[in-house]
A protein has these predicted regions:
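Acidic/His/Gly-enriched intrinsically disordered linker/tail segments
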Residues: 12-14, 44-110, 114, 260
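Conserved catalytic core of Hanks-type protein kinase domains
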Residues: 49, 118, 164
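Short, histidine-centered active-site or binding-site loop motifs used for metal coordination
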Residues: 1, 30-32, 91-93, 109, ...
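Flexible loop/turn segments at secondary-structure boundaries
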Residues: 2-3, 33-37, 49, 94-96, ...
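Non-catalytic accessory/interaction domains
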Residues: 24, 62, 77, 87-90, ...
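Zinc-dependent metallopeptidase catalytic helix centered on the HExxH motif
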Residues: 3-69, 128-129
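Short beta-alpha connecting loops at secondary-structure transitions
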Residues: 3-7, 34, 94-101, 132-133, ...
Length: 363
């Protein structure tokens, strides 16, 4: 099915993902079928979620999970537009429901992954198996899925999923240290600078990681109000804070400038490659929304450009253009070529210009 004798990694990955996705429709589409067109997202979202898990387990060298980081970031960018639509349009006509299929793939999959992380993998799997067993060779709606997941975990899954599935856009979670081990979390709708969007409220499964005095703790919570304060038990003080550990959540996040610098400084030791990628992607989103200045973004870009992980470096290259417009506004484009040479020469010299024997497919 692939042209030539040496297909590219991206072509191989695309073929495997599509094949696994279509096989997953045996369960989500054939074995259990949507009741009406407004739940078309159930078929496509679940098939993509399960298909990616299959592809990652069978072909770990193709970097399926790493490639999804970029896909989720791109759908977040689209979801920030005023024209964004909800994944599920209740009682929609077939023509209207079909318009949401595009966002259903990546946003829907990211939301399901967030809920899976919140519930725990075992509880989530029990809920999905319950859903499939109850509606085998029959029809089901979104409410049936939410009820099955809620039974498996005794959590407010229905209201949480509705807040992401039945309204457009995505939240921005602002994390502010208050001194000692206390922080404040506030949510609002994320939007790019100068764009007016309707206010929305979400029920957000948030996973935090923080470090202080040589100790590291994680805390999971549901942010179901505009703002809340909490203490990170196990720490006396906070040296650094990661507002989206995993990254597990479908949300943008913001730290004060000083705390963002502290997080970037400890990223090589305390953040996974996926979390470092998210740190960069999130910074680009903050640049677009006006929540991060050009200097702060350039400093972060320079730090992450020395990252050893190929997926993170690929993210750096993808986001080099995001800074050109802010620099042009400030009349600083003349220094851009030198920044590129200084930033990209070390990783280029380390990686080389040609594949090395035994090098992974992703590299």
């Amino acid at each position: 099915l692939l042209p030539g004798d040496t297909p590219s990694v991206s072509d191989r990955r695309r073929l495997i993902k599509v094949t696994a996705h279509e096989l997953a429709h045996i369960w989500f589409g054939d074995y259990v079928t949507m009741r009406w067109w407004d739940d078309l997202w159930l078929n496509e979202t679940f098939a993509d979620w399960l298909g990616d898990k299959i592809a990652e387990q069978v072909y770990p060298d193709l970097g399926v999970a790493a490639s999804e980081l970029g896909a989720v970031d791109r759908v977040m960018t689209s979801d920030a537009r005023p024209s964004a639509v909800a994944i599920r349009l209740v009682d929609a006509a077939p023509e209207a429901a079909l318009q949401t299929v595009g966002v259903a793939y990546n946003k829907g999959k990211a939301v399901l992954a967030m809920v899976e992380g919140w519930m725990g993998a075992e509880a989530y799997q029990r809920g999905v198996l319950d859903y499939v067993a109850r509606h085998a060779w029959g029809n089901a709606a979104g409410d049936d899925l939410w009820s099955a997941l809620a039974r498996a975990a005794d959590l407010p899954v229905a209201d949480t999923l509705r807040s992401f599935i039945e309204q457009p856009g995505l939240p921005l979670v602002v994390a502010e240290p208050l001194g000692g081990n206390r922080i404040r979390l506030t949510q609002r709708r994320y939007a790019t600078a100068g764009v007016e969007v309707a206010a929305e409220r979400w029920r957000i499964p948030v996973r935090l990681r923080a470090g202080g005095a040589g100790k590291v703790v994680e805390r999971a919570l549901l942010l179901d109000r505009e703002s809340t304060e909490l203490a990170l038990e196990g720490l006396d003080s906070i040296d650094w804070l990661l507002p989206n550990a995993g990254p597990s959540g479908y949300y943008r996040w913001r730290l004060p400038a000083r705390e963002l610098e502290q997080l970037a400084a400890v990223a090589p030791d305390h953040l996974s490659a996926f979390e470092r990628y998210n740190l960069l992607a999130n910074a680009a989103a903050l640049l677009a929304s006006g929540d991060l200045g050009a200097d702060g973004y350039l400093a972060l870009l320079g730090r992450i450009a020395v990252d050893p992980d190929p997926a993170v470096l690929d993210g750096v290259l993808d986001r080099l253009e995001t800074i050109r417009t802010p620099l042009a506004r400030e009349g600083r484009v003349a220094g851009w070529p030198e920044f590129l040479r200084t930033t990209l020469r070390p990783p280029l010299e380390r990686i080389g210009r040609a594949p090395r024997p035994g090098e992974s497919a992703q590299a």
